[in-house]
Amino acid sequence: MNNPIPSNLKSEAKKAAKILREFTEITSRNGPDKIIPAHVIAKAKGLAILSVIKAGFLVTARGGSGIVVARLPDGKWSAPSAIGIAGLGGGFEIGIEVSDLVIILNYDRAVEAFAKGGNLTLGGNLTVAVGPLGRNLEGNVALRNSAAVFTYCKSRGLFAGVSLEGSCLIERKETNRKFYCQDIRAYDILFGDTPRPAQAEDLYEILDSFTEKYENEGQRINARKAAREQRKSSAKELPAKPLSRPLQSSAPVQLNSGSQSNRNEYKLYPGLSSYHERVGNLNQPIEVTALYSFEGQQPGDLNFQAGDRITVISKTDSHFDWWEGKLRGQTGIFPANYVTMN
């Protein structure tokens, strides 16, 4: 666990980067279902990261230190403001425990309440809930929209639920004054033109990586959705295949060509009537072009892709029927309404 004793803002920013990394990276202790989802941080309006010590004997007291940053209108993160946390709780607890805490401020009003007043009491008008874990929980809209504040607590390396109702985030004015070398309020740090300090660059690298992860994941999801929609659209556009199939012959039957040729070709499907006048003419074979791709579903079907040119061996007068053709040395039947005459 990290040191909860208040220190200078440079040390607090370094500690915050370390804590956030421990809450978001997959390790032997933290599996994919035990990390803060990237979309939670990428969509947050503000973020408070602290180390907290809790001591109890009949009544528990909580105190600690950390920083808070806010999301600026351009999507970047503000300079950090030093904060403390304090609170009392009931319950029969004896002992001392040090925990790391990440508080997600989901709405602008939560950030503004702290920035304008210098203090923010969790609970009351700002509902608090234990935040979701794992990488696939963004679809839980009810959970995402129900709480103004998400909390994450890790004690002894393990995530644990924590009640922060009644706890107060407190502006550490003197720490901010020493770091920024001027009297400056939290509001001016979080919403003003205060540049991001180089001392907190590690923290910003981690925060910016979540936006990148979220955007990349969003692009992958959108690509998968588009592919599914394309497949659905293509499936809807495919014409219905003929219902009845010709019966396959148990023995080959020679195809009557109707010409002087000594062709030694055999008709696979004697039940399929032939158009002998043109089909049997070697000088002018009938060719059709595939309008759609067809993947055979039974032995003897002729596979082809849209754009393939198929030589017709035998056909009927109907396009809503099965014809026989040859493509790349393979012979088989195919739905005639998947092709067009050349």
Swiss-Prot record:
Residues 246-263 have a biased composition (Polar residues). SMART domains: SH3. GO terms for molecular function: phosphatidylinositol binding. Keywords: SH3 domain. Residues 218-264 are annotated as: Disordered. The keyword S-adenosyl-L-methionine does not apply. This is SH3 domain-containing YSC84-like protein 1. It comes from Pongo abelii (Sumatran orangutan).
